[in-house]
Amino acid sequence: MLLLKHGTIEILDQNTMYGWYELPKQEFWNGEQPEPITHYIKQFPLMKHVNPLENQKCACPMKWLLLSAPITNHWFN
C-alpha cells in the first residue's frame, strides 16, 4: 500500500502496517525510475513474523487503537 505523508511516498506492509521504504515524491513527478524494489527489500525486510501487539517497540499506535476499540454496528440500530 502507498501512503503519502510529509512530501514522501511510503510503502507499507498491509498486514502489519509497518513502513519499510520512503521515496521522495519528486522521483515520481520527474518520471525517474527508482532502484529496483528487490534492492530495498534486502535493506529493509518486512516484519511479517512480528506481532506488533506483543512487541510495543514495533507497534503501530493506530493499529493498536483500532484493534482495541469495541465492535459495534451503527448502521442497523
UniProtKB/Swiss-Prot annotation:
Q: What subcellular locations does the record give?
A: Plastid, Chloroplast
The question of whether Plastid is a record keyword is answered with yes
Question: Is Chloroplast among the key words of this record?
Answer: yes
Predominant localisation class: plastid
User: Sorted alphabetically, which keywords does the UniProt record give?
Assistant: Chloroplast, Plastid
Quick one: a GO cellular component term? chloroplast
Q: What is this protein called?
A: Putative uncharacterized protein ycf15
Question: Which species is this record about?
Answer: Nymphaea alba
